[in-house]
From Swiss-Prot:
Binds 1 Mg(2+) or Mn(2+) ion per subunit. Pfam families: Iso_dh. One of its GO terms (biological process) is L-leucine biosynthetic process. It is found in: Cytoplasm. Keywords: Amino-acid biosynthesis, Branched-chain amino acid biosynthesis, Cytoplasm, Leucine biosynthesis, Magnesium, Manganese, Metal-binding, NAD, Oxidoreductase. It is an enzyme of class 1 (oxidoreductase). This is 3-isopropylmalate dehydrogenase.
Length: 362
């Protein structure tokens, strides 16, 4: 079985973390000779701007469209500043062009050892386990806008259609139904103020009631949800579904609960993973960390993103489970980078996870 994976290493620590994820994927092929990965490296972000003038070259986009999945490192950095052409524009464009409408970001603890690293007390965060499902190609980030043209006025537009909301609701429902019993669904909005949120709430309610009556649906205002995530995060265990901007903010808030951005993976999908072959782009939740010295970045988020890719896009569930178990074992053994109060290097963590994967798959 051969799978084609586009590698978009990006900027600064991006090449370092994708290299460790590739190392772990290659460990799978050594333990499973019938599995083969074809890696094709392409440019995105600042590296692409330097080489081509564009943050997303046509070659990168076309190659990504033909692949089974895309694994991305990180984009951006002070070198490219806030000019007219910015690395982040490449990310927004590839999401839109590949119709990656659903962003999945799990928030949990891969090891009990991580509880004491959370900025919240361990007794508050223990047992936290939810996934944020963020609508990724609609809303205010893609709405009509007007820049300030010297008159001191600028505006952006938040717009959603019923079909866009139905689509992301079905993704959240599908994920909730993967557990037995099904997980509760939490829908976050600002329906007490925004017309777009009132449409959101109405559509989510109707979709769940008509298509997924077995699911428990809870509505929460986004500001209230932000407080709950700090006061009692496990109260929102299950699947959280929300709009593009709210999802951007709430998932970043959630990302600090486990203690480090270097732990958290993400997946952006273009369809339901009902056959475990959905096309997706996978990336860590952290940025490009331009100030970090070489070989110091935590590669676990990217390695876990690769595990999500194995499960959702490449139909390799056993191998995905092995990677996640290997990560837990490595953390338990204290082989962690400085952000987790360890002394191991990027490559040492990658080596340890790869070795554990081979043991588990033998």
């Amino acid at each position: 079985m051969s799978k084609n994976i586009i590698i978009l290493s990006g900027d600064h620590v991006g090449p370092e973390v994708t290299a460790e994820a590739i190392k772990v994927l290659e460990a799978i092929t050594q333990a499973r000779p019938n599995v083969k990965f074809n890696f094709d490296h392409k440019l995105i972000g600042g590296a692409a701007i330097d080489a081509t003038g564009s943050p997303l070259p046509d070659e990168t986009l076309e190659a990504s469209k033909k692949a089974d999945a895309v694994l991305l490192g990180a984009v951006g950095g002070p070198k490219w500043g806030t000019g007219a052409v910015r690395p982040e524009q490449g990310l927004l464009k590839i999401r839109k062009e590949l119709n990656l409408y659903a962003n999945l970001r799990p928030c949990n603890f891969m090891s009990e050892k991580l509880l004491d690293l959370s900025p919240l007390r361990s007794e508050i965060v223990k047992g936290t386990n939810f996934t944020v499902v963020r609508e990724l190609v609609g809303g205010i980030y893609f709405g009509t806008r007007k820049e300030d043209e010297g008159n001191g006025e600028a505006w952006d537009t938040e717009k959603y259609t019923v079909e866009e909301v139905k689509r992301i609701t079905r993704m959240a429902a599908f994920l909730a139904l993967q557990s037995n019993p099904p997980l509760p669904v939490w829908s976050l909005d600002k329906a007490n103020v925004l017309a777009s949120s009132r449409l959101w709430r109405k559509t989510v309610t109707e979709t769940i009631e008509k298509e997924f009556p077995q699911l428990t649906l809870n509505h929460q205002l986004i500001d209230s949800a932000a407080m709950i995530l700090i006061q009692n995060p496990s109260k929102m265990n299950g699947v959280i579904v929300t709009s593009n901007m709210f999802g951007d903010i709430i998932s970043d808030e959630a990302s600090v609960i486990p203690g480090s951005l270097g732990l958290l993976p993400s997946a952006s999908l273009s369809s339901l993973p009902d056959k475990n072959t959905a096309f997706g782009l996978y990336e860590p939740c952290h940025g490009s960390a331009p100030d970090l010295p070489p070989n110091k970045v935590n590669p676990i988020a990217t390695i876990l993103s690769a595990a999500m890719m194995l499960r959702l896009s490449l139909n390799l569930k056993e191998e995905a489970d092995a990677v996640e178990k290997a990560v837990s074992k490595v953390i338990d053994n204290g082989i962690v980078t400085a952000d987790l109060k360890g002394a191991s290097s990027t490559t040492e963590v990658g080596d340890a996870v790869a070795a554990e994967v081979q043991k588990l798959l033998k």
